[in-house]
Amino acid sequence: HSFPTRRSSDLVAQIGTKKISNIMGFYSIPDFMYNNRFSGEETILRFNEFVKKVEDKEKPDIIIIGVPEPILPLNKKHLFSFGIRAYEIYQAVDVDYCILNLLSGEYSDQFETEMKNVCKYRYNVDIDDFFVSNFSIVSNSLYSSELKYVYVQMNALPKSKNFFNADDLKDERWFNKIEARLKKYSMFEQF
């Protein structure tokens, strides 16, 4: 994909979900997020400190933070830490714009409403957009130790203006929407 060109003065810092994120030129979620060495409160405070250090070092216009696991368990075999990582991250930082990534599937207006409520009341974050990928879980891997994924043709997206997919990355509309929202926040930013 080609991404829209931005001003050379724009600086983005990214905290990725994989340990190998450093290879791609951005930060990785710290190891302490994955062990039980610290209490939940300590983990939240430490992650906040980590993000602050990134901010102080890079002085970015935007910090993109990937959440390393799904926000809800899939089944009894794949619990995804019950969304605890997401909870800790969302408590550690104030989110200006949140995009929830979804596997390929058919999504309704009711789904959008319910997921926004789950995120608002469980994680204290408002979902701005849903990004629907071209990947789906191979059904016979649901109960194996490792999930397998398959690339699928994109289903039609709901009529909601809050659903996007890879095709939307080919033009600037989605980026412009995000940029416009963030600019509104920056007008009222307090230091």
Regions found by a protein language model. Give the residues of each.
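Gly/Ser/Thr-rich loops at beta-strand to alpha-helix junctions
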Residues: 1-2, 18-21, 69-71, 106-107
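Short, small-residue-biased leader/transition segments that mark boundaries at the very start
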Residues: 3-8
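Hydrophobic anchor at the start of a short beta-strand
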Residues: 9-13, 127
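A structural signal for short, well-ordered beta-strand segments and their strand-loop junctions
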Residues: 12-16, 63-65
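P-loop NTPase switch/communication element
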Residues: 19-40
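Short, surface-exposed amphipathic charged segments that create phosphate/polyanion-binding patches used
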Residues: 27-32, 142-151, 175-185
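Conserved catalytic-core segment of NTP-binding enzymes
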Residues: 43-53, 62, 67-166, 174
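NTP-binding/hydrolysis catalytic cores, primarily Walker-type P-loop NTPases
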Residues: 157-191
